Amino acid sequence: MNSTFNQTDSGIFSNRTEENLLCCNFSSVVTDNGFAAAAPDERSLFIMRIVQIAVMCVLSLTVVFGIFFLGCNLLIKSEGMINFLVTDRRPSKEVEAVIVGAY
């Protein structure tokens, strides 16, 4: 019974990291002109960064215009409320007479 659980016997759970690492030499890819080729991850990271910048610009403009139009709407409503509360004042005839008389 002890022979089935022998520590030297790897069984199903064998440690194959050494065998997996031997197949790759981790050298860079070299093109025809001798320079190392750029990793495709760099290009995708660059594109992702550009997309992030574009999305942030669009969101920023949306927020700025939203605040602007909300402020304009509140300003229009407040002017309407002020005009509703203020009674119309008409200049008296005396004021017109004074203005005409001054010229």
UniProtKB/Swiss-Prot annotation:
Signal peptide: none annotated. GO terms for cellular component: cytoplasm; membrane. Keywords: Cytoplasm, Membrane, Transmembrane, Transmembrane helix. It is a single-pass membrane protein. It comes from the Eukaryota. It is found in: Cytoplasm; Membrane. InterPro entries: Reprimo_fam. The chain crosses the membrane at residues 50-70. Its main location: cytoplasm. Belongs to the reprimo family. This is Protein reprimo A. It comes from Danio rerio.
